[in-house]
């Protein structure tokens, strides 16, 4: 199978082909996901919670993400590899440039940043210097203390309009991909139709161009709170590779997320 690039995902959007993403943090799981046909793998700062045991993602460092990015890179040959930029690793454009370079040199094809209008200069700077950017709007976990917890965003008209405006602005600044997290499905659909770049949803309904889940949720090994938008595919299939295949197939068919896994 040919390598997935940002152009591949753009073609999927234009053709109406749903694509599937997942988090991974090591070579073995990444290789299994890659061989089953996952289109994009995110080395998420979620590693702070699912691997390191923290209550949120804030303690994660660029060195942490770079280490796991290098591990995942060794396990894959097809999927697009996206690396999260951790909390306070991109507070200024110059800081972002330094840390994004570290992640790209570790093997990432793209870096992901959380935020809207304040990030536009940084997105343009990175893009112009050869570092592809994925934006992230809605529930941005690095801002959990500003939000007062892991809460759905964009529920009122003012904030919904702000998220839409920021999506368009990120696209204009050069972002090639966008993640929407924990926003109303109707808003996610509006944004997906409004932008030309591919949109990946998590807790954002079924009308985004692609979906992403944390691997620990897909495999049913998450401890504590389990998000409504997640689904334990291992319980359904009994085998890891079959679980990933079921996830891919359900997204492609439009069966996931179902109403059961959609936030209102």
Curated annotation (Swiss-Prot):
Q: What GO terms fall under cellular component here?
A: cytoplasm
Q: What does this protein do?
A: Catalyzes the reversible reaction in which hydroxymethyl group from 5,10-methylenetetrahydrofolate is transferred onto alpha-ketoisovalerate to form ketopantoate.
Where is the major localization of this protein? Answer: cytoplasm
Q: How is the cofactor bound?
A: Binds 1 Mg(2+) ion per subunit.
Q: Which InterPro entries match?
A: Pantoate_hydroxy_MeTrfase, Pyrv/PenolPyrv_kinase-like_dom, Pyrv_kinase-like_dom_sf
Cofactor names: Mg(2+)
| HAMAP family assigned to the protein according to its UniProt record, in alphabetical order | PanB
Describe the subunit structure. Homodecamer; pentamer of dimers.
Q: Which gene encodes it?
A: panB
Tell me the enzyme class. Answer: transferase
| Annotated catalysed reactions | 3-methyl-2-oxobutanoate + (6R)-5,10-methylene-5,6,7,8-tetrahydrofolate + H2O = 2-dehydropantoate + (6S)-5,6,7,8-tetrahydrofolate
Q: Which domain of life is it from?
A: Bacteria
Q: Where does 3-methyl-2-oxobutanoate bind?
A: 45-46, 84, 112
Q: What is this protein called?
A: 3-methyl-2-oxobutanoate hydroxymethyltransferase
Q: Which residues form the active site?
A: 181 (proton acceptor)
Which positions make up the signal peptide?
A: none
């Amino acid at each position: 199978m040919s390598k997935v690039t940002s152009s591949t995902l753009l073609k999927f959007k234009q053709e109406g082909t749903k694509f599937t993403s997942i988090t991974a943090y090591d070579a073995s799981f990444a290789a299994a996901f890659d061989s089953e046909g996952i289109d994009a793998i995110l080395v998420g700062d979620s590693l702070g919670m699912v691997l390191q045991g923290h209550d949120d993602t804030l303690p994660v460092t660029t060195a942490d993400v770079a280490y796991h990015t290098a591990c995942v890179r060794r396990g894959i040959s097809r999927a697009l590899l996206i690396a999260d930029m951790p909390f306070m690793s991109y507070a200024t454009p110059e800081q972002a440039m330094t840390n994004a370079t570290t992640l790209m040199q570790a093997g990432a094809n793209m870096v992901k940043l959380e935020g809207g209008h304040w990030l536009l200069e940084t997105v343009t700077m990175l893009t112009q210097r050869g570092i592809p950017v994925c934006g992230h709007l809605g529930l941005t976990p690095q801002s959990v203390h500003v939000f007062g917890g892991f809460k759905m965003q964009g529920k009122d008209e003012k904030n919904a309009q702000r998220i839409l405006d920021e999506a368009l602005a990120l696209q204009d600044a050069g972002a090639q991909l966008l993640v929407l997290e924990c926003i109303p499905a109707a808003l996610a659909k509006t944004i997906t139709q409004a932008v030309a770049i591919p949109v990946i949803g998590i807790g954002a309904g079924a009308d985004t161009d692609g979906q992403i889940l944390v691997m620990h949720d897909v495999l049913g090994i998450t401890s504590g709170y389990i998000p409504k938008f997640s689904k334990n595919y291992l319980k359904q299939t009994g085998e890891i590779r079959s679980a990933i295949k079921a996830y891919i197939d359900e997204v492609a068919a439009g069966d996931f997320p179902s109403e059961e896994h959609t936030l209102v």
